[in-house]
A protein has these predicted regions:
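Conserved catalytic-core segment of nucleotide-activated headgroup transferases in glycan assembly
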Residues: 48, 282-328
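A glycosyltransferase accessory/donor-loop signature
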Residues: 2-16, 20-25, 32, 41, ...
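Conserved active-site histidine-acidic residue motif and adjacent donor-binding/catalytic loop
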Residues: 319-320, 336-349
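Nucleotide-activated donor-binding/catalytic signature segment of Leloir-type glycosyltransferases, i.e.
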Residues: 324-340
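Acidic donor-binding loop of glycosyltransferase active sites
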Residues: 351-364
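Active-site-proximal specificity loops/subdomain of glycosyltransferases
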Residues: 63-105
Length: 377
């Protein structure tokens, strides 16, 4: 069997853009959803909007996703422009649910699929990506099979080009500032208000809200349990607090979530390889290491250097907490940050680095120059 072994720009062609959002506390759910997506869909460019997920997670999973023709992008929502301190009346949903507002800030593709992390994909989503949005801003399935209000925002096929040209991000932020205390379902309510007359309704199979089982039983919506589950819907969404990863839950298809949670990435990659889909991943290897000790957020041209020199690894240390300007650098795989470090650890780091970069404009820490001379850096 002939395998596709492409590198560089060719690996980046014809990818379907998919976005997840969450924090490190939800990492198992994010990865489970990602594994289910990649088990049935190759050539996906996955963006993960986050504030605190470690680089190592991205570095390892990126290799697997690249092997099936995709890519994994670390999108750090760090800074005042990404503040999401709005109130939310649903205790099982945290502030990162509002992160989807910022999709246009990070995603380059014209069409993008947003997926909540409390779901699993059970099949090929090509037909979903091929949905014609027409003049609509997004496509979404009805909430709770029609028993809820409007659409469920856990699966959104978004016209990202239209969102960018109409500054939807800012419209959502302003509407949330105004209404967040008056709505019952957080950002889902806000999205429904803004797009109530400009969304395309998806078939339930693309957002089958199996997590509504408990609510349907409580409200005596018997019709929900008559909907066929064979074949499985394309996306199973475990809405509500009745989650399958908890010790106990009452909803159906709990086992489907666990199947993907325990599924090995090596199995996913080998399954695609058997179908003739395999790409050589871009394995990161630093050719040179450099170190900087800073006592200020201002490290001259560091963003530019990091982007222009991807084969050089930058170690940036500080004796204090780091500012947002520096923490944002953690999205690059060729940067390692050491906030709140100690002099003896700084010395060890400098000793193991190839060169020292003196990029600080002010508040220089003089003792480091003695170390530079000592170790001939």
């Amino acid at each position: 069997m002939n395998y596709l072994k492409l590198k560089g720009d060719k690996m980046l062609e014809d990818k379907k853009a998919v976005v997840f959002a969450g924090d490190y506390a939800y990492i198992r759910q994010i990865e489970t959803a990602m594994k289910s997506l990649c088990r049935h869909n190759s050539h996906v460019k996955v963006y993960v909007l986050n504030q605190d997920i470690p680089q190592e997670w991205f570095s390892r999973l990126r290799l697997y996703v690249q092997e099936i023709g995709g890519d994994l992008i670390d999108c750090k929502l760090i800074g005042q422009q990404f503040q999401m301190n709005w109130s939310n009346k649903l205790p099982h949903i945290n502030h990162m649910t509002f992160a989807r507002y910022f999709i246009p800030d990070f995603v380059t593709e014209d069409k993008v699929l947003y997926l909540d992390s409390d779901l699993v994909v059970t099949g090929d989503l090509t037909s979903l990506f091929e949905v014609d949005l027409g003049e609509n801003y997004l496509a979404a399935a009805r909430s709770c099979f029609g028993a809820g209000v409007g659409f469920n925002a856990g699966v959104l096929l978004i016209d990202n080009k239209k969102w960018k040209s109409n500054n939807i991000r800012q419209q959502l932020v302003e509407l949330t500032e105004k209404e967040h205390e008056n709505v019952g379902e957080g950002d889902q309510s806000i999205l429904n208000i803004l797009f109530q007359n400009s969304y395309y309704q998806l078939e339930d199979t693309y957002n089958f809200q199996i997590g509504f089982d408990a609510g349907a039983a409580e409200k005596n919506h018997a019709f929900v349990f008559e909907i066929p589950l064979t074949p499985l819907p394309k996306i199973l969404h475990y809405i509500s607090p009745d989650k399958p990863w908890k010790q106990f839950s009452v909803g159906r298809l709990r086992e489907e979530w666990w199947k993907y949670s325990f599924m090995e990435w090596s199995y996913i990659v080998s399954s695609w390889k058997e179908k003739g889909v395999w790409y050589s991943p871009n394995i990161y290897e630093a050719k040179l290491t450099c170190m900087n000790l800073t006592n200020s957020w201002c490290v001259e041209k560091i963003d530019y250097l990091v982007e222009q020199l991807p084969e050089i690894h930058f170690y940036i240390a500080a004796h204090t907490y780091m500012s947002d300007e520096l923490k944002r650098l953690s999205k690059y795989q060729n940067v390692t940050l050491y906030p709140n470090s100690f002099p003896i650890l700084v010395e060890k780091l400098l000793q193991s680095s190839d060169i020292y970069l003196d990029l600080n404009l002010d508040q220089k820490l003089v003792y480091v120059y003695d170390l530079v001379k000592k170790y001939n850096k």
